[in-house]
Design a protein with these regions (language model features):
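S-adenosylmethionine
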Residues: 1-448
Length: 448
């Protein structure tokens, strides 16, 4: 039995897995669907054929192509091969895994569920990659960092001399973090419960309610007692810290204006000890429906969901000045989450960024009306680009003299949240390199 047929310990043979990776990359390019959605769909469809190691291998291969995308394009141009998902994948096999032509020919044999046979021009071009490393001395800094051109200028502005190191961290394997639901359990109790079921975690270094998985394997989180009881949710430590910066208390009226599926809503409900009043609003009904399921499982009783027709919904005007805290977790380019979503680097361009900046400005203008005098607006994104963050806030404050910027460092100290994790004082910024979590930006505005 040859390499293309062998299953070894996997549910699928290597050649079949490679073909599946190629199909999924093509689907990404043709439909614009994100990596997670495509993986989830394929895994569900093939659940009887795939073992956990199959899934991990498929995801790692796709991630490798996406994380090395700009470098692979550079190489394909150098060896004069047209850039397609097929040639990108084959080039990555040689440069990342050190496969040789003979191995690729075995895997690409044109049989059922196998990639088509290598063409003469492909063989000629790919041979020029043998013995080469992924990084070449003639590559520019941005190509080595695999930074898309639409984000290059902004990230260089933010990262400065640390651009290459910060970009490398944005390509590292992400941590898997969880937030403990303190409405029903302590962090120690949840960690022990997970451990008894073979799910090993440790306390997160910055979030007082976070756990981090320390070794792969064990059951899926959804299969654990702690998850079924609503004691724990998946949430990156950085996202947890942004929720803490809101400073929600049980005596307050609080709104999560772009609540989505409710991750930060859940975190704030726990901080409020199920007291006060919490509104989770969004323009997307499907996301709010997912929030409903999560809120019920977590035992949250102080929150209501409200679907908005648009950013300037009439309800916002009617509710003007009613809230102590307004969290705007604004839609953004997601540059801070590239280590989780490497496909998003290549699915956006300058036009998309400009549209997001315009939408963020509109959301700021609308949602800030909800804050009462002395209340606070917390603006946050999972982007690291200045046009979505610092410059967005500077423009807002210039046009709105009824708000002032509070120093994030002072707010952090006021809330007694421990060591301040950001290198900025007025603004709050986290990066994978500096904090080992997703990249986030946040700031605190006070209504005068």
């Amino acid at each position: 039995m040859n390499d293309s047929q062998a299953k070894s310990a996997y549910g699928l043979g290597r050649a079949a897995r490679l073909n599946l990776v190629w199909e999924m990359l093509n689907e990404m390019g043709e439909t614009g669907r994100n990596m997670d959605a495509i993986l989830s769909s394929r895994f569900k469809h093939l659940q009887d054929s795939l073992e956990r190691r199959d899934r991990r291998d498929l995801e790692n291969r796709i991630r490798s192509v996406l994380l090395n995308y700009r470098k692979l394009l550079w190489w394909l141009k150098k060896i004069k091969l047209a850039p397609t998902m097929r040639t990108l994948l084959l080039a990555d096999m040689i440069l990342s895994e050190k496969s040789d032509i003979a191995q690729l020919e075995k895997l690409c044999n044109g049989a059922h569920n196998r990639m088509d046979m290598l063409r003469k021009e492909e063989i000629a071009g790919l041979k020029r990659l043998l013995g080469q490393d992924m990084i070449h001395e003639d590559m520019s800094e941005a190509v080595i960092a695999d930074c898309p051109q639409w984000a290059e200028q902004g990230l260089k502005e933010v990262f400065g001399d640390h651009f290459t190191e910060e970009m490398r961290a944005l390509g590292n394997k992400p941590t898997t973090d969880f937030r403990v639901n303190t409405l029903h359990a302590s962090r120690d109790n949840v960690r022990e419960s997970l451990s008894q079921q073979g799910f090993k975690t440790e306390n997160t270094p910055l979030s007082p309610v976070g756990l981090r998985q320390i070794q792969p394997g064990g059951p899926l989180l959804s299969e654990t007692d702690a998850f079924r009881k609503g004691w724990v949710e998946v949430q990156d430590e950085g996202s947890q810290l942004v929720a803490h910066l809101v400073g929600a208390k049980k005596s307050m009226q609080v709104i999560d204006f772009c609540a989505g599926a409710g991750g930060k809503t859940l975190a704030m409900a726990a901080q409020m000890e199920n007291g006060g009043h919490l509104v989770a609003s969004d323009v997307h009904s499907k996301r709010l429906q997912r929030a409903k399921v999560r809120l019920k499982r977590a035992g949250v009783v102080n929150a209501e969901r409200r679907q908005l027709e648009n950013t300037f919904d009439k309800w916002v005007k009617k509710s003007k000045g009613k809230f102590d805290r307004v969290l705007i977790d604004a839609p953004c380019s997601g540059t801070g989450t590239w280590r989780r979503n490497p496909d998003s680097k290549w699915s956006k361009d300058e036009t998309d960024l400009a549209e997001l900046v315009k939408l963020q400005s509109e959301i700021l203008q609308s949602a800030t009306r909800l804050a009462k005098s002395g209340g606070r607006v917390i603006y946050a994104t999972c982007s690291l680009l200045p046009e979505e963050n610092e410059r967005q806030i500077e423009a807002f404050l210039k046009a709105n003299d009824t708000f002032k910027l509070l120093k994030a460092k002072d707010v952090w100290a006021e809330l007694d949240l421990g060591d301040y994790p950001s290198r900025l004082e007025s603004y709050f910024r986290l990066t994978p390199l500096q904090n080992n979590c997703d990249g986030f930006f946040a700031c605190v505005l006070e209504k005068l």
